[in-house]
């Protein structure tokens, strides 16, 4: 029997409002998930509007198959391929809005078989697309101490990174231990490795699990490529609406929008003519409003929305 997992779209109205949807516009939802944002966009489009949604999770693609609408197209792949897909559909410079809802969806977290959560025991996998790449369990068996430490520190911002990495390496080198292939095994190991002085409200494994997930899915590289792709394919006055869920993601989005809003930097001390400065280009986007966070009411209804941040930009 297949278990059904509910997903509540975070900052749904705010992110859709940020797109300033035109009834006959062309839109891209880079993260279909379970379709909350896509269905809302479709409800605001007229007969000539178009929505292209992207996801690399086969379960999301199956969910998208339930939408029978000639205005809707689902694309199976990573959102980093957005610019490529836009070229294939002749959409470059014609897209009126791009939505990116970053991170893991609730169904992915709640389905123990996907291996994303330390709260439910399941196979130690964590791949967004289980048909490609390697599971976390395999990487942890092969990576050296320094690599594991770097991943936990870089992507989990965990000050106990070395201690956790050492515990993982020592565990796998002990031939008496069972192979570490379950999320429960890893969560228990990290909890035991945490110092007795650990006082954070979060579970000791929270940051390490986030780090492994980000690394195994190349999430930050995916986001960087997707943001650049979105800036390229948007039409003038097209909107970019991005929801992030942790500080690493939000910093990337904030810096990207700031950089695109400033335009290229003119090198100091190098005399340039006005024509040469013009050749360097100008600002590509502008920030729309301030960063938006969920209301207390939304957080009460959906505690997972607590860390979310929405940023909106417009193509010039």
UniProtKB/Swiss-Prot annotation:
Annotated localization: Cytoplasm
Gene3D superfamilies to which the protein is assigned, alphabetical: Putative methyltransferase TM0872, insert domain (1.10.150.170), Vaccinia Virus protein VP39 (3.40.50.150)
Cysteine disulfide partners in this protein: none
rRNA processing among keywords: yes
EC number of this enzyme: 2.1.1.199
InterPro entries for the chain: RsmH, SAM-dep_MeTrfase_MraW_recog, SAM-dependent_MTases_sf
Pfam families (alphabetical): Methyltransf_5
This protein's GO CC annotations: cytoplasm
Any GO BP annotation: rRNA base methylation
Residues the record lists as binding S-adenosyl-L-methionine: 35-37, 55, 79, 101, 108
GO molecular function: rRNA (cytosine-N4-)-methyltransferase activity
Key words, A-Z: Cytoplasm, Methyltransferase, rRNA processing, S-adenosyl-L-methionine, Transferase
Primary localization: cytoplasm
Family, as annotated: Belongs to the methyltransferase superfamily. RsmH family.
Protein name: Ribosomal RNA small subunit methyltransferase H
Organism of derivation: Vibrio parahaemolyticus serotype O3:K6 (strain RIMD 2210633)
Name of encoding gene: rsmH
């Amino acid at each position: 029997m297949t278990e059904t997992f509910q997903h509540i779209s975070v900052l749904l109205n705010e992110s859709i409002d940020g797109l300033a949807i035109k009834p006959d516009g062309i839109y891209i939802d880079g993260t279909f998930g379970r379709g909350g944002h896509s269905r809302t966009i479709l409800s605001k489009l007229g007969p000539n509007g178009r929505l292209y949604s992207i996801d690399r999770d086969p379960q999301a693609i199956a969910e998208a198959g339930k939408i029978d609408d000639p205005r809707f197209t689902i694309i199976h792949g990573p959102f980093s391929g957005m610019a490529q897909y836009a070229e294939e559909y002749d959409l470059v410079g014609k897209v009126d809005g791009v939505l990116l809802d970053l991170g893991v969806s609730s169904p992915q977290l709640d389905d123990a078989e996907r291996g994303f959560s330390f709260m439910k025991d399941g196979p130690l996998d964590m791949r967004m697309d289980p048909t490609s790449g390697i599971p976390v369990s395999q990487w942890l068996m092969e990576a050296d101490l320094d690599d594991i430490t770097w991943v936990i520190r870089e992507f989990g911002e965990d000050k106990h990174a070395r201690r956790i990495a050492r515990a993982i390496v020592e565990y796998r080198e002990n031939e008496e231990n069972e192979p570490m292939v379950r999320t429960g095994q890893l969560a228990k190991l990290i909890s035991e490795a945490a110092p007795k002085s650990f006082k954070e409200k979060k579970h000791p494994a929270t940051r390490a699990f986030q780090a492994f997930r980000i690394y195994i899915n190349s999430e930050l590289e995916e986001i960087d490529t997707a943001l650049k792709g979105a800036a390229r394919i948007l039409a003038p006055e097209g909107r970019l609406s991005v929801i992030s869920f942790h500080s690493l993601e939000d910093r990337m989005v904030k810096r990207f929008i700031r950089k695109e809003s400033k335009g290229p930097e003119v090198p100091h001390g190098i005399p340039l003519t006005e024509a040469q400065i013009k050749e360097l280009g100008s600002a590509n986007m502008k920030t729309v409003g301030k960063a938006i966070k969920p209301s207390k009411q939304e957080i009460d209804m959906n505690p997972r929305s607590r860390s979310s941040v929405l940023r909106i930009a417009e193509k010039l």
